[in-house]
Amino acid sequence: MCVICFVKALVHVFKIYLTANYSYNFRSWPVDFRWDDLHVPGTNNSSHRALTCAAAAAGVWLLHDAALGEDALTRPPRGARSQVQCLLQQIRELPSQLASYALAHSLGRWLVYPGSMFLMTRALLPLLQQGQERLVDRYRGRRAKLVACDGNEIDTMFMDRRQHPGSHGRGLCLVICCEGNAGFYEMGCLSAPLEAGYSVLGWNHPGFGGSTGAPFPQHDANAMDVVVKYALHRLHFSPANVVVYGWSIGGFTATWATMTYPELGALVLDATFDDLVPLALKVMPQSWKGLVVRTVREHFNLNVAEQLCCYPGPVLLLRRTQDDVVSTSGHVPSLPSCQVEGDVEGNRGNELLLRLLEHRYPSVMAREGRTVVIRWLRASNLAQETALYARYHVDDEWCLATLRSYREGRQKDLDHTKTWGPHGPSFPWFVGQGLSARRRRHLALFLARRHLKNLEATHCSPLEPEDFQLPWRL
């Protein structure tokens, strides 16, 4: 055997050995990065508070308390309450609390996160192994074990394109992919940005694939926290070059990341909902309504819309017009002036867009603005969307000029204040005050079209690489 043939054979055997290593127990791997493994000077800056704080995911519980009407910052101390009333209240609520806990830790967890079921993981194991081999062989993926602040081990895969960024420089941008409730990075949503030429970091929810733990919201947030830290401090991407992409239930961790790290570059949400409660009520018996609402609020409070409104950066929503998973019938009010094909009225992405625009541009979305956006949301295909947009004769150039003029005015006013955020003047913007109803409708339609893109696809259809786009920037 010649020397060249021997080297080729050795490389082939080494590849087989590396691939085989992916199939053994991930717990045997050494830890590559911990949530507190930070050696960056100046991290006491408030904008990086989550990078050095053990309670990085405390924001989940703050929103949890707010959802239950118990804002920890405003409620009186317990010492001021009647001890007897508190005791009686706790006794009355004990049966429902026990029922909620039992439901959440049995049937509820399997319904919300079916990918954490052992039988599903075993059934998908051959496909997961093939997916790992593909990412390693074709894209030179690097698998790593991260440890979150709760001790869970998080399985990740990183594909680095910085050495060959492409003609558009996409490889210099990192896309962190947050999978759905039955998705794994080995065969999940990361394929679209990966094939589009971006650097990609995929990770599995706690309890999915090689990740340990259970996929409850707090654990998911802790996992997302260490993934973001890994991207910034070990992979050395600047925050402005990091895009968070969440598909389906991955929108919760995606919005949590951008809420906690507002300096991150952009957010893309694909087939995502605003709140889990309406979707849970759709599939559960009506007689269980009280128990379902309590269980979701206490154990699965995936309040995506609330977290989305806390992020000041560029956002793009991808709505799938044939999506029946994140849809509840008849939620958006019916408007007789627009006929649609298909059922897009109940898509929870509609509510997500409305909440976002109402938070960022309250004057534009008042009355006429909200009505015309609801009408636009009922368009189920590109032809209807374009026809409605043309009917109102929206002047894109005027809308852009108006928004830029308002931003420049805010910039001058905020030059000597601390309200300047990482993406410019903080929201809400009160642009549109004093404009006619017609002009407000134009701005509302313009903003809606820039923040939401329709895709003629079902919930689980793989996203095409050309459909993965970065959000619009003013």
Curated annotation (Swiss-Prot):
Pfam families in UniProt: Abhydrolase_1 (PF00561)
Enzyme class: hydrolase
Limits of the AB hydrolase-1 domain: 175-293
Enzymatic reactions: a 1,2-diacyl-sn-glycero-3-phospho-L-serine + H2O = a 2-acyl-sn-glycero-3-phospho-L-serine + a fatty acid + H(+); a 1-acylglycerol + H2O = glycerol + a fatty acid + H(+); 1-(9Z-octadecenoyl)-glycerol + H2O = glycerol + (9Z)-octadecenoate + H(+)
GO biological process: monoacylglycerol catabolic process; phosphatidylserine catabolic process
UniProt keyword list: Hydrolase, Lipid metabolism, Phospholipid metabolism
Any GO MF annotation of the entry: monoacylglycerol lipase activity
The keyword DNA damage belongs to this UniProt entry's keyword annotation: no
Biological role stated in the UniProt entry: Hydrolyzes the sn-1 position of glycerophospholipids with high specificity towards phosphatidylserine (PS), PS-PLA1 enzyme. Also hydrolyzes the acyl chain of glycerolipids with a preference for the monoacylglycerol (MAG) 1-acylglycerol, MAG lipase. Plays a regulatory role in cellular lipid homeostasis by modulating genes involved in neutral lipid degradation and in phospholipid synthesis and composition.
UniProt-recorded name of the protein: ABHD16B
Gene name of the encoded protein: Abhd16b
